[in-house]
């Protein structure tokens, strides 16, 4: 190519670009000392889109904008596993760190420092090439695919603190807020245990109670009131906090505040019949017996009806009477509810009558395209087998004979189990090897079944449907699952890998989310922990405590946090807990 033809070609390309691009190119060419290389594949496009992902023709691919709300278990897990260069990822969260929430009760009494269980999110953002904004989403405009954000409360930034963001895909991972059940006085007078700030506030309050009770000129009744600690809720959080607080009283308070130790009291209130009712009955029984031996006042069947600055009132189920009791501090851990931004979003998309935001089995928000919800933010609305029973039968009955042979049924067995996880749960509960055994039990020795026998065989399967627990384990698995789906989005669009569509043609793009339970722990104090592991395996005692140490240390998200937490545990063993209020 001659210099003249090169000049004409370059000139025409130059004129085709906007003025800002021309300025950039002129600045580059006029800087001197550079090398100008010509290529027939459009050199200006290569210069302007050097960092962009290009298609086979060299054209830049527009990246889909993925906005992630939240930096908790599900959000952090999603961001950690996402590896697809075709997404422009923006993260919005008022918390610029990931918090290892299972160790929050240990922060309340100084066993572990708060800084030891947080991992700054900026490191992950830098590593992945994502952008982060420290702000809170206060409004979701689903129809226009926008979110309205406000900078973190208490920010000292001057000027506007609000901004809007567009999105192509929205990931809701904002978690949940404590549920007070509209009980009067709870918001004003009780402490919660959801954030690092909550744990630190409880820690300071506990120390302040002992310092106030140590002051002179107080009556015995006043000291008893100040040192009465009430925990509302007999779930894992309430039980673990009660156990941690009892250990602090026995192991540290006796040395630090010997004159007031005799006035301390811990009361655990539970509206149900038992504490830890989601665990094996053996664990529940052991926990209740241990708390009674430890002197923790366990009251089941007690529903809190009001909290004032000085008293907590409960309604006793057996007698129906309302009893009021003075207290020094109340910790509330009775469950979770949707955040205001999620409630408003639910109204927009027709889910206003629901208690929790609903998604399908692929974590897509029902009634709103391009929005996913993870963790405590939502619950999976698992489709029932009986809703699709006729479609399943017709899909298997390829010859339209009105009956199914074993061969016909076997062709869709795998897809049924993948699409409806409750089928597998039902088989395990009834000790059946496969669905064929289920059909046999309903049809006797017949080799064929009609639609009525088919319905009869599967009629009880949906009884095994249950909501997933609001735990870190579930949230983390959901984040990882969704990230892996995004990583292979383009591949699965061409070659779907999910189960058959019983209503319609083809297959679902991905396998639906399937939760795998790896076990649960319930620390009970005194270096004893209850462990419930898959396979109906229960372990209680000191050995389970060491298993708890090893599992939690391994689940921390970085070596930095592992080293800090292990050093905190070591410090506690050697020197005791930190009782300072800073």
From Swiss-Prot:
Signal peptide: none annotated. Its EC number is 1.6.5.9. NAD(+) binds at residues 227-263. Disruption phenotype: Lower reactive oxygen species formation and altered phenotype (e.g. growth rate, root:shoot ratios and leaf area). Lower leaf area early in development followed by a prompt subsequent increase in leaf area leading to larger leaves in mature plants. Better tolerance to salinity stress. These phenotypes are probably due to an enhanced expression of NDB2 and AOX. No effect of calcium ions on activity. One of its GO terms (molecular function) is oxidoreductase activity. PROSITE patterns: EF_HAND_2. GO terms for cellular component: extrinsic component of mitochondrial inner membrane; mitochondrial intermembrane space; mitochondrion; peroxisome. Residues 384-419 form the EF-hand domain. A motif (Microbody targeting signal) lies at residues 573-582. Its cofactor is FAD. Induction: Induced by chloramphenicol (Chl), erythromycin (Ery), paraquat (Par), rotenone (Rot) and salicylic acid (SA). InterPro entries: EF-hand-dom_pair, EF_hand_dom, FAD/NAD-bd_sf, FAD/NAD-binding_dom, NDH-2, NDH2-like_C. Expressed in seedlings, roots, cotyledons, stems, buds and flowers and, to a lower extent, in stems and leaves. Binds 1 FAD per subunit. It catalyses: a quinone + NADH + H(+) = a quinol + NAD(+); a ubiquinone + NADH + H(+) = a ubiquinol + NAD(+). Its main location: mitochondrion. Belongs to the NADH dehydrogenase family. This is External alternative NAD(P)H-ubiquinone oxidoreductase B4, mitochondrial.
